[in-house]
Amino acid sequence: MPAARTGTLAAVALILLCGAAVLGRPAPDDLCFADVRRTGMAPSRPLGPVLNLAASDLTSRVSVRAVDASRGCALALLDMAETVVPGGPRAADVVDVGWAYQDGDCMVPLAYRQYFNCTGGALPGQNVCAGLSETRIRGGFGTSDYALYGTSLVLRPGLYDRGTYIYFLGYGPDDIYVGSVTLMVGADIHKYPCGLDRGLGVALHHKSGPARPLTEDDATGDWACGCFPAVVEVDVVWGNVSAAELGLADPIDYADEGGEVEVLEDEAGSASGNLPQDDPDPDLADCRTVGLFSESDMFRTARGPESLLIGAVAKDVLTVPLNLPPGRSYEALRNASLECNSRPRETGDAAVVVMSLQEPARLERRPDARATDPEFGLFGLPDDPAVRRGILIGLAIALLVLLFSLVIVLVCACRLARAAKAARRARAATFAKSNPAYEPMLRV
């Protein structure tokens, strides 16, 4: 789509013009596992009182902006920037970290954790801090879509996960440092096997459409790149992992009167439990303006360690239907993904983003798939307020730079003209002195 291509590249170019950092890294392959792991540092204490933050508290403090790009069926990491804290992360008894997704004036909380007794010099993590708390993550009545890897956000981006992600480091209620990552998802939903016609935006107004089956001709290029973990029997391996460890609602919370869970397909095509009729339905969007990180149906505290939560994100690949070409097995897809992931990637900050987005989503113009097109409003500007605001700010800065350059050119031209005129007068005066007959003709 020309409009989508123009809007996406314009957003990246203008963010670069404004001096944003450029990030672009898929998660390491060793994070793509579906078995139950409880390695690394376990939570040393429950999550303490969270910072009472409003959406405006974060948006008004954003000091570092970055761009990230995701293609295909990637397991992605969105990174915090160490420069978000002037002078670098400091030593502290408690450091709060959190991530949220911005949707206009409200935000969707995604992850929150506390680190204890940190030495500073680097972002909080298991090598910098003596302990960590339980993690509060978005999941609720659905699947495990997010996890934290240190301070980085782990997710499997779909088309509707594009947008602006806000993060913060907190050293106290009035000592908060905020940055943002704008995620561009440049992937053709009809080319990849993982069902990219999904994402957080589906619960925030967008509607997904049906995907056509992949053909053998589609299985070319980077179609297999991404996270496809080794096969495990999910029901058996994860059967002893409690919902509380993963930050999910216990099945008994949304069982029907007979004690069985009734699973329905919602408009986005994802499975969700049916709540008892006398209980209010959960707010699936959970987009807030105040109390961003307080617990809710969709944002619960997970008791499990970091490795367990990361595995829960990756194992969901094995529980959803994959759109494979006829005759292709999952094992063949996994082998192809390992080969694809091992290919050298483009290096250099600007190259990562530009190369990732030169072939953006080319969604077919079919009546039944019209809703999958990226949304662009007046003059081709995106409907997303945050992206639109960034583009307009970038245009304003570019215009000011152009006007300033024009003023400099005009000043230089005026000075040159005056110098030339003075030189002509000097030559005329010299000529008149040496030729008295011409002196009456001299005008000064």
Curated annotation (Swiss-Prot):
Residues 1-24 form the signal peptide. It is a single-pass membrane protein. Pfam families: Herpes_glycop_D (PF01537). Glycans are attached at residues 117, 240, 335. Keywords: Glycoprotein, Membrane, Signal, Transmembrane, Transmembrane helix. GO terms for cellular component: membrane. It is found in: Membrane. The keyword Membrane applies. The keyword Lipid metabolism does not apply. The chain crosses the membrane at residues 390-414. Belongs to the herpesviridae glycoprotein G family. This is Glycoprotein GX. It comes from Bovine herpesvirus 1.2 (strain ST) (BoHV-1).
